[in-house]
From Swiss-Prot:
Reactions performed catalytically: L-tryptophan + O2 = indole-3-acetamide + CO2 + H2O
Recorded family membership: Belongs to the tryptophan 2-monooxygenase family.
Keywords, comma-separated and alphabetical: Auxin biosynthesis, Crown gall tumor, Flavoprotein, FMN, Monooxygenase, Oxidoreductase, Plasmid
Flavoprotein found in the keyword field: yes
Gene giving rise to this polypeptide: tms1
Coiled-coil regions listed in the entry: none
GO-annotated molecular function: L-amino-acid oxidase activity; tryptophan 2-monooxygenase activity
Protein name: Tryptophan 2-monooxygenase
Length: 755
């Protein structure tokens, strides 16, 4: 017997008008309004079912209810329904709203997910990660700006993913339902609005290991020009700063502004800046060779604070591989990688796999590890708790992996990001050559996986810039600043410090000349090798606690070598040659740098060799720079003769126009930068927090990039400098500005991981 006319009418024309919530911009209000919409829809449907069932002569509700898709009653029983959300962009939402009927809108193939748009435990980046893992489709934030709330039958097919929320093992099980129009997946659209999940901010954000943002503290102190001060009745300390690198100069400068007028800086070399060293060529002083730090990401917020303060914020993009035309040489075969395009096909698997890992994270056995992009997004949006807990899970699972073994575990496993399993050793070698954005990482494959991952999460591998004036202009300008009638540079003594010892309540500094001086406080920024071998600070526990001594003695310092060549012309522009070359021979990475873009006839600069670790160590056997240049030129000519024929110094002057440096044999450095081996991240923790340990304050404080979580980056040097200054002001009775690192409630990690 056929159903009544009312039943047929309801089955074909059940109203599906959605509730418009686009004006709601508060999460708690959106939560309430969405709940009300679901309740009203269910109540409305219940009334209709009762009415229709009463009129149905068979006593059974029509299975085409709710526009023919939503079976509320089957065999006399009500089918359970769930709430879910389809995330879409504004354009797709408009098409849905304009469609008549809405069922013809482009929703087929989309995934509904049980994460609400007012959920504050998840960020937008995590949503992108979850949707990709559930659907295999990539989304950009603009594609997820809006949502449609739906009721969906529990009989619909679904897939569940375990996504971590808390470090104690608690996970959020995220369920997705694929929407199809043909397969009678029963669902009903209820409401629509804007996605209010946490989004990244445009300002600064903290680094993952610290979860404290130093930039707002510096910004806040800009008006007063100081991070602390001493009341009139409080005596000011006599302070020594060991090392006139960027960290030591920031320490001295900030102490002077805080009112400490007895500050002496000891510098063993004849220049200031440390690893911020820009060599200017005699015949072209505007062309500079960055012998140390040369790439500066905008995410280095403290660095850019000081660059802006001293009028040096005008930066240009660094010519990293793929951002400019890049020549790749692998096993003697040449490949061209055009700027801004995909790399050659040979490299697609590793290129796509690494980028998929950044966006999608890693699915391993029982858990989805948060993607680096999602963690960065959480830092930007202020979701510190989730960022902390996600990072702790990475530490627990990968803390004892080298970068090499971590890559193997991720890309040779059952769920490789990008969907393609890498081959060994072929893809290994390709990845070593190509790297993760700033060139090949092959020489540091045995460093810790976590050490490399933190650089990515902190944003240090993105949008790297170069300083047109040369980065050593920053320490020069700090040193030339006059405070209370005396410049910082006038307080520098160019002499080596041989020993630092406790002497009752004072700290004794013994110089190479044999002279000794007593100080109330000492900040040591001279690097780990000097701390151990020259200053003899780790011989006992009179100054540092045993774990700090262990970290100083055992932290790994990376070897690095650079050789620059100033050429008569910018030959790569004259002859339309790529300005970046990556090779698997001894040259490794070659960069053509233009410091005079306004002058097409100006001199060219080529960083003909930038190597790390074993590749750098080999070059130590050829200390003569002319011989080393000839060796490198010959190696390049075998694969790229059209490029190599231009690698001769301007005016054939090897003495003035070729410069090289090996950081491992630099007696004042003992290495280029700290790079933790696997399982050694707790060394960074001991070194970084030493100055903030007020319970064990001996008057000697560590600072410098090697005492931070980001060895080799200026950011860590400035952060630790701030720590030391705050410790001195606080310990000596001064008053610090609010929001300083000493009063911050640090949320520490467990770096002694269990894997």
């Amino acid at each position: 017997m056929s159903a009544s006319p009312l039943l047929d009418n309801q089955c074909d024309h059940l109203p599906t008008k959605m509730v418009d919530l686009t004006m709601v911009d508060k999460a708690d209000e959106l939560d309430r309004r969405v709940s009300d919409a679901f309740l009203e829809r269910e109540a409305s449907r219940g009334r209709r079912i009762t009415q229709i069932s009463t009129e149905c002569s068979a006593g059974l509700a029509c299975k085409r209810l709710a526009d023919g898709r939503f079976p509320e009653i089957s065999a006399g029983g009500k089918v359970a329904v769930l709430s879910a959300y389809i995330y879409i962009g504004k354009e797709i939402l408009g098409r849905i709203l304009e469609s008549k009927p809405w069922a013809r809108a482009t929703v087929s193939g989309l995934v509904a997910i049980d994460l609400a748009p007012f959920c504050m435990d998840f960020s937008e980046a995590q949503l992108i990660q979850a949707l990709f893992l559930l659907s295999g489709k990539r989304c950009a934030p603009i594609d997820l700006s809006h949502f449609v709330a739906i009721s969906i039958s529990k009989t619909a097919g679904f897939r569940t993913l375990p996504m971590p929320l808390y470090e104690n093992g608690t996970m959020k099980c995220v369920t997705g339902f694929t929407i199809t129009l043909e397969g009678a997946v029963p669902f009903d659209m209820v409401a629509y609005g804007r996605n209010l999940m946490l989004k990244g901010s445009a300002g600064s954000f903290p680094t993952i290991d610290l979860l404290y943002d130093y930039r707002p503290f510096f910004d806040q102190c800009s008006d007063s020009g100081r991070i602390g001060f001493f009341p009139e009745d409080v005596p000011k300390p006599k302070v020594a700063v060991i090392g006139a690198g960027i960290s030591g100069l920031v320490v001295a400068n900030e102490l002077l502004h805080a009112g400490v007028d007895d500050v002496t800086i000891y510098e063993a070399s004849d220049r200031v800046g440390g690893k911020l060293w820009s060599h200017a060529f005699r015949d072209a002083p505007s062309v500079v060779a960055e012998m140390g730090a040369m790439r500066f990401p905008p995410a280095a917020f403290c660095l850019f604070f000081f660059l802006e303060r001293y009028g040096l914020s005008s930066m240009r993009p660094f010519p990293n591989p793929g951002t400019v035309d890049t020549y790749l040489v692998y096993q003697g075969v040449q490949y061209m990688w055009k700027a801004g395009q995909l790399p050659p096909k040979l490299f697609h698997r590793v290129y796509n796999g690494w980028r998929a890992f950044l966006k999608d994270g890693f699915y391993e056995r029982d858990i989805v590890l948060a993607s680096p992009v999602a963690i960065t997004q959480a830092l930007k949006s202020g979701d510190i708790r989730w960022a902390h807990d996600s990072w702790q899970i990475w530490l627990n699972r990968f803390g004892r992996e080298s970068f090499s073994s971590g890559i193997e575990r991720i890309f040779l496993g059952t769920h490789p990001p990008g969907g393609e399993t890498w081959s060994f050793p072929h893809d290994w070698d390709l990845f070593k050559l190509m790297g993760i954005g700033s060139g090949g990482f092959g020489p540091v494959f045995e460093s810790g996986f976590i050490e490399i991952l933190r650089l990515v999460i902190n944003g240090y591998e993105e949008n790297q810039r170069m300083c047109p004036e040369g980065i050593s202009e920053l320490p020069r300008r700090i040193a030339s600043e006059v405070v209370n009638g005396v410049s910082v540079s006038q307080r520098i003594c160019h002499v080596q410090v041989r020993a630092i010892q406790k002497e009752k309540t004072k700290i004794k500094i013994r110089l190479k000349s044999g002279i000794s001086e007593l100080y109330d406080k000492v900040v040591v920024t001279s690097g780990l090798a000097n701390i151990q071998l020259r200053h003899c600070l780790t011989c006992d526990t009179n100054i540092f606690q045993a774990p700090v001594n262990q970290a100083v003695d055992n932290s790994h310092m990376t070897g690095s070598s650079k050789l620059f060549l100033m050429t008569e012309r910018k030959f790569w522009l004259d002859h339309i040659l790529p300005s970046c070359v990556l090779m698997d021979g001894i040259a490794k990475a070659v960069y053509c740098l233009d410091y005079e873009p306004q002058d097409p006839n100006g001199k060219g600069l080529v960083l003909i060799s930038y190597t790390w670790e074993d590749d750098s160590h080999k070059l130590l056997a050829v200390p003569d720079k002319k011989e080393r240049l000839c060796l490198l030129r010959d190696a390049i000519s075998r694969s790229f003769p059209a490029f190599a024929q231009h690698l001769f110094p301007a005016c054939a002057d090897y003495d003035q126009n070729v410069i090289q440096h090996d950081w491992l044999t630099d007696e004042n450095a003992g290495g280029a930068f700290k790079l933790n081996r696997r399982g050694e991240d707790f060394y960074s923790e001991e070194l970084f927090f030493q100055a903030l340990d007020t319970a064990n304050d001996t008057g000697v404080y560590l600072a410098g990039c090697s005492c931070s979580f980001t060895g080799g980056w200026v950011e860590g040097a400035i952060q630790t400098a701030c720590n030391a200054v705050c410790a001195i002001i606080h310990n000596c009775g001064g008053i610090l500005a609010k929001g300083n690192p000493l009063e911050h409630s640090w949320k520490r990690y467990n770096y002694r991981t269990r894997n």
